[in-house]
Amino acid sequence: MISITSIQQLRLHLAEEKRKNHSVGFVPTMGALHRGHISLIKQAKAENTVCVASIFVNPLQFNNPEDFNKYPIQRESDMKLMSEAGCDILFMPDVAEFYPTRPNMKIDIGLLDQILEGAHRPGHFSGVAIVVSKLFHIIEPGKAYFGQKDIQQVAVIRQLVSELNFPIEIIACPIIREESGLAMSSRNMRLSAQGKAVAANIYKALSVIEKQIKQDKVTVSDAQHAGKNYLNQFKEIEVEYLEIVAADTLEAITEYADQTKIAVCIAAYVEGVRLIDNLVIIL
């Protein structure tokens, strides 16, 4: 694996790979890697000649400065994990290289910026869209890989690719979970052992809702209440939102008519750490 910090150097290196007709798969990350990230690297390497990954903590997508300052940085261990997983090129620019001046532009995502994560993290998806657009322009991959845990981010990026005609296939990879069911996340590092045990109930609540819908055939409203009632047992969990939505648009639904695939999406705080998760349900 080679590590590159310069945009110009990366472009020169990738130009040579493409001259050889090598396919390029890309995995963007912010570091603090876990098994979820590693699964993306392995899939990208399996499906492409060259696997490129990036580590860049993007300041534009943090609407809470404290959250940005607390984001875990562990460059040496991240580089080791990347190399062992099969990454060929690791791009690690600093902020001055990536944003010589802070961008003045914002990207209006439309409806996706007004619901779920968009409603609770103003400006977040504009920041995501800018950093991903820049990375796509710099790297020009054939495929890019993202985790399904960030289901709304995947939807935003698919919209970005479609509307701006990026010739890139977006691959959404399955959520990787701990044995307890807790979705793998870099933020989990900030939880105590007890906090992790409590946070596992977030996924259990999603499973309760799935059972209510698929086995007990309850209404959308009743299924949602069942999930909230389950979480109400745990005073350590503060739910920000728990929504049942159409899986394609992520718009909230009130009934199952005409729906073939729905998603249950949640954001909650445990020990002051904001966690998100989702469960897609085939009807």
Swiss-Prot record:
Keywords tagged on the record: ATP-binding, Cytoplasm, Ligase, Nucleotide-binding, Pantothenate biosynthesis
Keyword RNA-binding: no
Enzyme type, top EC level: ligase
The reaction(s) this protein catalyses: (R)-pantoate + beta-alanine + ATP = (R)-pantothenate + AMP + diphosphate + H(+)
GO cellular component: cytosol
Amino-acid positions noted as binding beta-alanine in the UniProt annotation, renumbered to this chain: Q61
Pathway named in the protein's UniProt entry: Cofactor biosynthesis; (R)-pantothenate biosynthesis; (R)-pantothenate from (R)-pantoate and beta-alanine: step 1/1
Subcellular location per the Swiss-Prot or TrEMBL entry: Cytoplasm
Active-site residues, as the UniProt record annotates them: H37
InterPro entries: Cyt_trans-like, Pantoate_ligase, Pantoate_ligase_C, Rossmann-like_a/b/a_fold
Binding residues for (R)-pantoate: Q61, Q153
Residues involved in ATP binding: 30-37, 147-150, 176, 184-187
SUPFAM superfamilies: Nucleotidylyl transferase
Annotated EC: 6.3.2.1
S-S pairs: none
Database matches in Pfam families: Pantoate_ligase
The family this protein is said to belong to: Belongs to the pantothenate synthetase family.
Role according to the record: Catalyzes the condensation of pantoate with beta-alanine in an ATP-dependent reaction via a pantoyl-adenylate intermediate.
More details: The reaction proceeds by a bi uni uni bi ping pong mechanism.
Subunit structure of this chain's protein: Homodimer.
Protein's recorded name: Pantothenate synthetase
Name of the gene encoding the protein in the UniProt record: panC
